[in-house]
Each structure stands twice: as structure tokens, then as C-alpha cells.
């Protein structure tokens, strides 16, 4: 994504909030997938009335039979994010004084491993590849403490949406043989600036790792 700067610049530098406490998400252990929008283009979201912190709100979406449906992944091992580097001009003689200019940022790529998983689960998850290719797939992240990470609406702070992802992929099985378990690689990409409105929530009456189960 390219950086678009206001021109002319504002009268003063932007206000930067003061840090009051550290904020860090834990190890990503599971995720929930949901379409970003329904067939009419309306965004899928949790609201004050259907709170993201209440199990009942999730149960309704897990059992849904329409575009609001949510599905939960198996446990994901070896979760890792990479990328997000600055995109720059080439520097050298192409730039004044040889100093490169920042023109944007690279996407963040998530990778993980599904270990000892029934391949019927993997087969079903591969259908999500087309959902992501259509630009209509998002995830909610669950850490080892049962916290949830999602996109918070800038105006209505009680509204939360899935994190948009692209380039979703689940690989075929790699046999672990003697020293390891069989595994399937999983990956997707977040678009630049995806985390600008990212928020962490603690559920009130459930643990998403153990209490959210896909409908049969």
C-alpha cells in the first residue's frame, strides 16, 4: 500500500496519545473465520446488543446458515508474523543525496502449522481459499489466555469486525515420519495498516479456545 500524505500539511503535528500501560496480544492458538460482508454488502459485525464478549453472540453465528456464519479453526502451532517492512525508492543516484523515500509498506504474512489433523478438516478449510480470493474473508484471533483480537469501529467503540485477510492457503499434508507429527501448513496475509484499529477484548462468560465449537 502506498502512503498518501495531506497537502498542504496540517497546521500542527498530530496528537499522539500518552501510553498508560503495555498492550500485547499473546500466542495465537485458534482463529475464527467470517465473511466480511453479506450478500447485500452490509458488514458483518458484533454490536452493543450482540456483544463480542458474550458467548450467546458467538453461538448464534456458529449456527447461522447465511453469510454471517462463523467457523473456528483447529489449534494452530508455530504461529508467526513476518513482513511489514517499509517500501522505499531505490536510493543511490535515483534519489536526492542518495536518500531513499518511504512510499508505503509491505503486507504482514501469518504462517502456522496444523498438526495431526484429520484431512477432512483440511479439505473443508481449503474452500476458504476462494473466499479470500474474492476479498471477502476475515479472522478473529484467539490467544492462549482466551482473549479476542478484532477490528474496532473508529466511531462506535462497541462495534467489532473481523480482520480482513488475503492470500489464504492451507497446504497438503507433510508426513512427520519418525521424528515429528504429520502437519499441514497454513498461511494468510494482512493488508498494510490492518492493525490501526485493532483491539483486544476479554470475554465475559466463555473461553473461545474451548467453548466455541463448529456446528455439525
What is the role of each PLM region?
Residues 118, 132-134, 198, 205:
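General structural signal for secondary-structure boundaries
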Residues 123-158:
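Short, acidic/charged, Gly/Pro-enriched secondary-structure junctions
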Residues 109-119, 145-172:
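Short acidic, glycine/tyrosine-flanked loop/strand segments centered on an H-E-D-like triad
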Residues 11, 60-63, 68, 123, ...:
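Polar/charged alpha-helical tracts
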Residues 2-111, 163-180:
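Solvent-exposed edge beta-strands and adjacent loop segments
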Residues 31-37, 110-113, 135-146:
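Short, hydrophobic/proline-enriched secondary-structure or compact coil segments at domain edges
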Residues 97-123, 179-196:
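Oligomerization/assembly interface segments of phage tail-like spikes and tubes
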Residues 159-216:
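Mixed-charge, glycine-accented linear interaction segment located at domain edges/termini
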Amino acid at each position: 500500500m502506498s502512503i498518501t500524505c495531506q497537502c498542504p500539511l496540517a497546521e500542527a503535528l498530530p496528537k499522539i496519545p500518552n501510553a498508560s500501560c503495555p498492550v500485547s496480544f499473546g500466542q495465537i492458538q485458534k482463529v475464527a473465520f467470517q465473511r466480511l460482508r453479506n450478500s447485500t454488502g452490509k458488514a458483518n459485525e458484533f454490536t452493543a446488543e450482540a456483544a463480542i464478549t458474550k458467548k450467546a453472540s458467538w453461538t448464534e453465528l456458529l449456527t447461522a446458515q447465511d453469510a454471517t456464519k462463523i467457523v473456528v479453526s483447529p489449534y494452530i502451532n508455530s504461529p508467526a508474523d513476518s513482513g511489514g517492512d517499509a517500501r522505499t525508492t531505490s536510493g543511490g543516484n535515483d534519489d536526492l543525496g542518495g536518500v531513499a523515500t518511504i512510499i508505503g509498506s509491505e503486507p504482514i504474512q501469518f504462517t502456522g502449522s496444523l498438526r495431526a489433523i484429520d484431512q477432512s478438516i483440511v479439505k473443508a478449510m481449503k474452500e476458504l481459499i476462494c473466499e479470500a480470493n474474492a476479498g471477502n474473508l476475515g479472522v478473529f484471533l484467539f490467544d492462549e489466555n482466551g482473549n479476542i483480537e478484532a477490528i474496532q469501529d473508529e466511531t462506535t467503540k462497541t462495534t467489532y469486525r473481523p480482520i480482513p485477510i488475503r492470500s489464504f492457503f492451507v497446504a497438503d499434508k507433510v508426513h512427520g515420519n519418525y521424528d515429528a507429527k504429520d502437519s499441514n501448513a497454513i498461511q494468510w496475509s494482512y493488508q498494510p495498516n490492518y492493525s490501526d484499529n485493532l483491539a483486544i477484548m476479554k470475554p465475559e462468560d466463555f473461553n473461545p479456545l474451548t467453548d466455541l465449537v463448529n456446528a455439525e
